[in-house]
Amino acid sequence: MHLIKQFSTLFLLLLSLCFASFSIHAQELPTRSFCIFDPIGEKGPAYQGMLDYKAAALEWGALLDLNVYTNEAVALADFKAGHCDAVGLTGTRIRPFNKFTATIEAVGAIDDYDQMRKLVGMLANPKASKYMIEGDYEVAGIMPAGAVFVFVRDKAINSVEAAAGKRLATIDYDVASIKVVKHIGATMVPVSIATFAPRFNNGYVDLAYAPAIAYKPFEMYKGMGDKGGILRFNLAQMNGQLILRKDRFPAQFGQKSREYAYKNFPKALEHILEAEKNIPEKYWVDLSKEKHTKYKEMLRQVRIELKDEGIYDPRMLKILFKLRCRANPSHYECVENLEG
């Protein structure tokens, strides 16, 4: 009994020393502010995922002070103003800091999650690190947020022709989406991530676009009601990216962070697939093969236009082109080679 008591005392002593050592180590590390956009707040998946990231970052040489924002524009403004050393944003917001990785969200450029996984793996490779840095900024991780689908208040809006003249909620800073709206002849209604769902749900717009993870928290089912639906067509691959002021972090922090993000890709994908699966089947609207082919070509033309206008980075478009053609080498775009 005495021996057990001695062992317990020794164990507790060792445990307290470990915690003390950990505490001292954390105190010695530089504290860096990390601003995270999560529309749901502290209970949202982006912020919750960053709690594990924060623990991992201690080994990379930084103690992170996490701040969550439910308004992405405010998070972006604070980062630009220097109030944040790093920030987590949606891919569309990344363009001022890295046009190369912002082009991941190019419309129709990634066919499925396997291509997305391969891309994130390629970009997490140390050989790709030079593309992750532009000026003072470094992309420190890319995580999937899911395929972007079109939500409609009436299933009769199941074609480009049917969408002509309809009011489409359009993220006002998303140049690609604005061009798509013009292509289909819809009426653009400017919105933000904070306002697109309320406008869709109250009938102010006829269509909106979002990944499946938006369905439940944004209550998109209210806007669809009994007549609405979701077109099963991958408009783009939404993603989240972490941006650092690289001079505020240790030299290898960004690389280790990118590797961490890729390692956790399956976990993020599981959350996305679950969200898609949990949407009632009655809402999904399948397009004919002819429509699918027609709309993919329309998006390809939009990509080429945006590349020529300097919005999309041709280097990223070339990588995405190669991923698509490896998966489907007989496709006519692989012969035409307009993005290769």
Protein language model regions, located:
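Sec/Tat signal peptide C-region and signal peptidase I cleavage site
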Residues: 22-26
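Bilobed "Venus flytrap"/periplasmic-binding protein-like clamshell domains
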Residues: 28-60, 138-202, 206
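Contiguous mixed-secondary-structure segments that line small-molecule binding/active-site clefts
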Residues: 90-184, 234-339
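Bacterial N-terminal signal peptides
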Residues: 10-20
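A beta-strand-loop signature enriched in Asp, Gly, Thr, and Trp
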Residues: 217-232, 242-244
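Short, glycine-/small- and polar/acidic-enriched structural segments
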Residues: 28-148, 213, 222, 230-236
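Bacterial N-terminal signal peptides that target proteins for export
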Residues: 2-11
